[in-house]
């Protein structure tokens, strides 16, 4: 329950000075506000979060050559787990959580299986759901990258080295 969570936190961090607790709480609140600001939008409204952002513009940005500006599905799912653990989410956070969960439901891939040894996507009745590691901003299409910096819409166009060395699909 919420009361138990708060009581545990109060006991667990009782050694922390009250002033520092207040500063940490304010920093945490600013972090949540930033998460809300960074959540991307598509034609349906709020969607997911990008993997990385430009430090000044806060727009989705490139990281490594095969990590393009895109929605980061696996990382967004982890972020949802965190947000769902908060004891008293605000109305804005609840809207954010529902929007991201709805995005995941709308874009689940079924009847496809990511073969872990062959590193290929195969048709398989009843398989899934699974999601791509990255989804294109605005279109939500699965996208993939390679060391050449090119963007691909078919994971099989990615070199075997990158298919073996990167998690392109997640369950």
Please annotate each region the language model reported.
Residues 1, 62-76, 86-89:
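Solvent-exposed loop and edge beta-strand segments that line ligand/cofactor-binding
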Residues 2, 38-41, 85-89, 107:
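Alpha-solenoid helical repeat scaffolds
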Residues 4-29, 86-98:
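Structural helix-adjacent loops and short alpha-helical linkers that scaffold large soluble proteins
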Residues 11, 15, 63-66, 84, ...:
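A general structural-boundary detector
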Residues 20, 24-46:
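Beta-propeller domains
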Residues 32-35, 77-83, 101-104:
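Short, structured motif recognition centered on aromatic/hydrophobic residues
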Residues 41, 45, 55, 102-171:
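CBM-like carbohydrate-recognition segments
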Residues 45-70:
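Intrinsic, low-complexity N-terminal interaction/targeting segments
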């Amino acid at each position: 329950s919420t009361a138990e969570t708060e009581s545990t936190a109060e006991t667990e961090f009782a050694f922390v000075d009250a002033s520092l607790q207040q500063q940490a709480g304010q920093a945490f609140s600013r972090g949540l506000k930033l998460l809300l600001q960074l959540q991307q939008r598509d034609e349906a409204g709020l969607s997911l979060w990008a993997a990385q952002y430009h430090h000044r513009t806060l727009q989705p940005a490139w990281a490594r050559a095969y990590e393009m500006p895109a929605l980061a599905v696996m990382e967004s799912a982890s972020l949802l787990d965190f947000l769902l653990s908060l004891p008293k989410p605000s109305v804005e956070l609840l809207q954010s959580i529902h929007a991201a969960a709805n995005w995941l439901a709308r874009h689940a891939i079924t009847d496809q299986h990511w073969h872990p040894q062959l590193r290929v996507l195969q048709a398989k009745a009843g398989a899934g759901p699974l999601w791509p590691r990255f989804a294109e901003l605005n279109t939500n299409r699965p996208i993939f990258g390679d060391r050449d910096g090119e963007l691909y819409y078919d994971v099989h166009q990615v070199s075997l080295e990158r298919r073996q060395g990167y998690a392109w699909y997640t369950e």
